[in-house]
Amino acid sequence: MNSSKRYERTLVAILFFTWGTVFLDRMSPLYLAPYFAPELHLSHAQIGTLASVLAITWAGSTFFFGALSDRVGRKRVLIPAVFIFSILSWMTGLAHSFHHLLWIRGLMGLAEGPTWSIMTALIEESSAVQRRGRNIGFVVSAAALVGLAAAPVLTTQVAARWGWRSAFFLAGVPGFLMGALIWKFVKEPAHEENESHEKPTLRDYVSLLRFRNMWLCCLGATGFMSWLFALNVFAPLYITEVAHQPATTAGLLLGATGLGSFFLGFLLPSLSDRVGRKPVLLVSAAMSAFIPLAFLVPIFYVYPFLLAAIVFVTNSGQGMASLLMVLVPTESVPPQFRATSIGLATLVGEIFGATAAPIVVGNLSEKYGLSLGMWMAAAGSAVVFMVALFLRETDQHPESHGGSPQFSR
């Protein structure tokens, strides 16, 4: 493991902006839909389908290509993926029909999926043990800062001035730069001394589910993704249609959640380096449940800045992602399965949380109202909390384990 602080800082900086670019490309269609939907004559259902197809292909590719990178190396898979999703962002700007967009977004999910499992595995492998949580948390928090806070402003401002096609072209540019930086500066991690050099078999991959923490993380990832997408899809509608607040208030509240997620997404995994993964995950899950519940309290809308402050200090979603989908899985399995473990947790979470949960909530909300979306988001956090109660602690500080990883089934 390369534990040089200088290299760690370089790696973390490059992958921070790369992950931010990935989420910029993933979230851009949600923000640009009001611009391209009328031109391409898209229905609300078709816009939702575009998001779902990307989630499905992302889920499969993050597992498959993560496992492939465990066998052939990280950079051989990551660099082509970064360049391909950047090209596909440009191609989105050339689309002239729903079917064009459907194919392009599906292919983009295939290209972007590997970046999650491979980049987080790179950080985990190249960081000193006492800085793993901090480094993972910082990189993962880029999704909140770029994808949830900066992307809505950047893409809509460009679309308003030069059109939605120009916004997609602009969103694709950073990926080419980050791909070049990864090629030049990122090193292939060295094998650990205790790591087997034999190629894993199919039976070895299936055996990952024998690890208690692994299947618990899959369940927790489903709860986290349900919380994330139920909140982000239905909170804007609830605030404007049920709470009868102007769109500017919705923007203020959602912007506050995005910024809060960035800061807590960095701080909480860093704290887990000191006190352990399990207690921080318990606190993160409990805090995140407050956000959808706060949106249900009418009196808070009389004081919108107070509500913004509440959701700012309680949005620990990115912290949950770092712990549930990266740190705990990779610390629970043998080193040669790190990217595979990340991909497996993400696969289950994307399918049952990111894809299925919004569809179920959307259909039920037609009958029971949009408040159901907030209750379902809170329920997702409750699932994460329950999972955390049964997790085995994976903090592997040298002073705790004599410097040798221990894997418990």
Residue ranges with predicted function:
Residues P29-L30, N213-F262:
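Extracytoplasmic gate region of multi-pass secondary transporters
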Residues V139-K184:
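Helix-loop-helix hairpin linking two adjacent transmembrane segments in secondary transporters
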Residues K278-V328:
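C-terminal transmembrane helical hairpin of 12-TM major facilitator-type secondary transporters
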Residues I104-A143:
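Cytoplasmic helix-loop-helix junction between adjacent transmembrane helices
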Residues K184-D204, H397-P405:
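Flexible cytoplasmic inter-helical loops of multi-pass small-molecule transporters
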Residues G60-H96, S272-V275:
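Conserved MFS/SLC helix-loop-helix module at the cytosolic interface between two early adjacent transmembrane helices
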